[in-house]
Structures are given as C-alpha cells and as structure tokens.
Amino acid sequence: MRLPVCLILLGPLIAQGTEEDCPHKKAVTLLPSFTMTPTATESTASPTTSHRPTTTSHGNVTVHTSSGPTTVTHNPATTTSHGNATISHATVSPTTNGTATSPRSSTVGPHPGPPPPSPSPRSKGALGNYTWANGSQPCVQLQAQIQIRILYPIQGGRKAWGISVLNPNKTKVQGGCDGTHPHLSLSFPYGQLTFGFKQDLHQSPSTVYLDYMAVEYNVSFPQAAQWTFMAQNSSLRELQAPLGQSFCCGNASIVLSPAVHLDLLSLRLQAAQLPDKGHFGPCFSCNRDQSLLLPLIIGLVLLGLLTLVLIAFCITRRRQSTYQPL
C-alpha cells in the first residue's frame, strides 16, 4: 500500500522535472477517441392534391391528369353546377401517358313531327255559312266555298300549284264588330284565315270592302319541299258593296301574294247593316258578273236590231213584187 501511494506522490515531481529538462516540447492533451457515423435523413414529401373547379360546358369534356413527384392534379370527368345547371357526363378511357379525353359529342336536332294532312279534295257540299254576331245582331256573314291555291316548290327546283278546300264542319268562327272595322277569323285544322273589313263613309253611297286578309296553313302537298305557308295583304280593296247590301259573285279570287291565292266560290258576303235573323241584304253583283252581263245585253240589243232590219227588208221586197207593169 505504501508503494503505490509513494508513486502517486512522486508523479507530479517527475513531470515537473521533465518540463524543466525539455522546455521546447509542448504538452499534448489526449481526448478519448470515438467514431461518428453519418445518419441518412429521409425526407418524404407528402403528395399534395389540388382540385381545380371545372365549368360545365356543352361542348367536349377533356380531363387532364398530370403526375409528378410532389403534385397530382385531378380533373373530375363529371361536373355539376348549382346555377342553371347542365350536367355533362364524359366517358374516360385509361391511357398510359396520363391524359384522358372523352369522345366528341354530337348534337342531334329534334326529329320533325308528323307531316300535316294532305289537302282536302274538292266537294260540292263544301259550301259554308260563317256568321259572327254582336249579341243577337250579326255584323259579318260569309257564305262561300273556300279554296286555297298555293304555288309550292317541289324537288328539282320546279314549282306546282296545290289546291285545298275548307271543310265547314271542321271550321270554327271568331270575329269582332268593331265599329267601322269588323273582322272575321276562320280556324280549321292546321290553319287559319282572317278577313278584315273597312267602311268608307266618305264615298257616296257609303260602302264596305275587304281591306286586310291573312292566311296561315300547314299542308303536305305531293313532293312539296315545305309544309308551312303564310301570306298577308293589308292594302286590299276587294268585295266592295254599298252599306246594307250583300256582295254576290260566282267566283271571286283574292291575291294575297304571288304564291298564295284565295278563291271564294258561290260567294255571298255582307259585313255591315245586316238584317235581323241572319238574312242577307239585296245582292250587289261583282264586277266579273257585270262584265259578263253587259256584253250579253249589247249582243241581245244588236240581235234585235238585226232582226228588225231583216223584217223591214222582207216587207219592202214583198210590196215591190205586188206592182204589175202596164
């Protein structure tokens, strides 16, 4: 025990003497050795998903998907808006390059409805009597066989005339007794006719005439390129008659346009001052009837004069034959 203690006590003295013997040597401090092992730090970036709002469109819908190391973008194939909503559904097919495209959308127009019926054939029993009254007092009365003539286009760029006759049993009457402007409307399957009349109180005698007419008709003529026909004319002065009289004509034709004509057969019309109980006033013949009557009267007069001349000539010859020469 004493020996180790002595060694411990003598240690510093020996070290001090050594320092004095070697003044040029530096002291070295020994540190315990250890090993540093670098630790790899793994950083994992969590993928971030962003959703971009899409807007509903009526055209093609294209969905783009882009994939990267940190960001993934998804465009939903179906988008529904909560306003005036239109829902577009896209069918996406898988691809390998990260882009999916829906097929092109096609817009199909509405299928045309069934064609309107063919024009009605002519019939002798198609004479209709159409009356509109203000209470118990009639103001417009029309009696006629009504037929519509239409010049319609056909295949090949040509045109043809089509004729359709109104059926009185399938025609509804409406109208108005508006002072000096009465009117009459005839509604029938797939069409309508409107007659507008005007009184001329400044003329002597006062008259009433047709000043406006419109027609709208849906009809399927043979090989026709269209079905709907419309025309109107607001500058007419037709079917004119004195107030209190009815306009009478065997065949009155009204031209609404170069392609739409209206024929009124066996016509009798009165649009003002009708007698009670739906009767017509005295008949006023149309110009066509008057133009035929005047040549007939002139012809009969000439024939009568010629007959008188022949009779006078025969009498003169007979008197001359009774005298005998001396």
From Swiss-Prot:
Biased amino acid composition, Polar residues: 59-69, 81-108
Extracellular side stretches: 21-291
Region (Disordered): 38-129
Modifications made to the protein after synthesis: N- and O-glycosylated.
Sequence repeat ranges, renumbered to this chain: 44-49, 50-64, 65-72, 73-88
Expressing tissues: Expressed in tissue macrophages and to a lesser extent in dendritic cells.
Signal peptide: 1-20
Cytoplasmic side: 317-326
Disulfide bonds: 139-177, 249-286
Keyword Nuclease appears in the UniProt entry: no
Protein keywords: Cell membrane, Disulfide bond, Endosome, Glycoprotein, Lysosome, Membrane, Repeat, Signal, Transmembrane, Transmembrane helix
Residue stretches of biased makeup (Pro residues): 111-120
GO biological process: cellular response to lipopolysaccharide; cellular response to nutrient levels; cellular response to oxidised low-density lipoprotein particle stimulus; inflammatory response to antigenic stimulus; negative regulation of dendritic cell antigen processing and presentation
Protein's UniProt keywords contain Disulfide bond: yes
Annotated transmembrane regions: 292-316
Family that this chain belongs to: Belongs to the LAMP family.
Protein name per the record: Macrosialin
Gene name linked to the record: Cd68
